């Protein structure tokens, strides 16, 4: 049984993989001041709720974009499972060629997604990860990670409008029926959601132009808001909610088995 840990800015996603299938996955809040004891309690409770024995965990791999939680997280994993986790970072075997000016700058989440997309789809891909930040990454058919771009996430954009404009309320992220709206809440939703969809479509268009090698890139979306955006645009070919966990599983096999 392999434990997969994806620590993002907002949530930590955990998955348990055994016998070529996922048997459980959970999402807990990322909190910078949480101790290793608190993380230990949470993960042991989650395992117990699913009738999983911690002693059956034979390997662990961690991807994190939150440096200030890593000390507590690693201590928790060592204490609960008695083994050293693989940490996604410089020196790890990926099977892709990172063409960034400084490969060490590429976030662990982007590497994990790129590895998964390359190994699973075997074609040029554009990966959009709708998280706290929205990242766009391009990978060629030969496994060259070309780079991409990073944008404020959808919730960050909406929250910034609420925080900086005194008379505008915080709104739910729901797609309105029309672009031309007749009340403040729907008008904000229209501007934020349709504006974001337009951003996605334009960035995908420009990335395809720059990647042009005769093969149309396949556009994959993942992350918590992927379905919301994908339902409103033809720019996204597929939503793969498990892309990051798949990437962690692949990286574990490359580096431990």
From Swiss-Prot:
Catalytic activities: (R)-pantothenate + ATP = (R)-4'-phosphopantothenate + ADP + H(+)
Annotated substrate binding sites: 100, 107-110, 184
SUPFAM superfamilies in UniProt: Actin-like ATPase domain
Entry-linked Pfam families: Pan_kinase
Gene3D superfamilies: 3.30.420.40
Keyword field contains Transcription: no
Keyword set, alphabetical order: ATP-binding, Coenzyme A biosynthesis, Cytoplasm, Kinase, Metal-binding, Nucleotide-binding, Potassium, Transferase
Keyword Transferase: yes
Localization (cell): Cytoplasm
Function: Catalyzes the phosphorylation of pantothenate (Pan), the first step in CoA biosynthesis.
Name this polypeptide is given: Type III pantothenate kinase
């Amino acid at each position: 049984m392999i434990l997969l840990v994806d620590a993002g800015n907002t949530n930590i996603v955990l998955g348990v993989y055994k016998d070529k299938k996922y048997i459980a996955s959970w999402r807990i809040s990322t909190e910078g001041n949480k101790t290793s004891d608190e993380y230990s309690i949470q993960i042991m409770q989650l395992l117990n709720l699913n009738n999983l024995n911690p002693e059956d965990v034979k390997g662990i791999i961690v991807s994190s974009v939150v440096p200030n939680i890593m000390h507590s997280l690693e201590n928790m994993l060592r204490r609960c499972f008695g083994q050293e986790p693989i940490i996604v970072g410089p020196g790890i075997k990926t099977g892709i060629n990172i063409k960034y000016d400084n490969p060490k700058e590429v976030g662990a989440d982007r590497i994990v997604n790129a590895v998964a997309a390359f190994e699973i789809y075997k074609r040029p891909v554009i990966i959009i990860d709708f998280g706290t930040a929205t990242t766009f990454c391009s990978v060629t058919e030969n496994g060259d990670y070309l780079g991409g771009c990073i944008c404020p996430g959808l919730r960050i954009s909406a929250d910034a409008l609420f925080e900086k404009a005194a008379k505008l309320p915080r709104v739910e992220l729901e797609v309105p029926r029309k672009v031309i709206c007749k009340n403040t809440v729907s008008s904000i939703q229209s501007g934020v959601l349709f504006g974001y969809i337009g951003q996605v479509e334009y960035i995908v268009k420009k990335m395809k132009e720059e990647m042009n090698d005769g093969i149309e890139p396949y556009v994959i979306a993942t992350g918590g808001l992927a379905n919301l955006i994908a339902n409103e645009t033809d720019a996204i070919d597929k939503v793969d909610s498990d892309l990051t966990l798949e990437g962690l599983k692949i990286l574990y096999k490359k580096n431990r088995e």
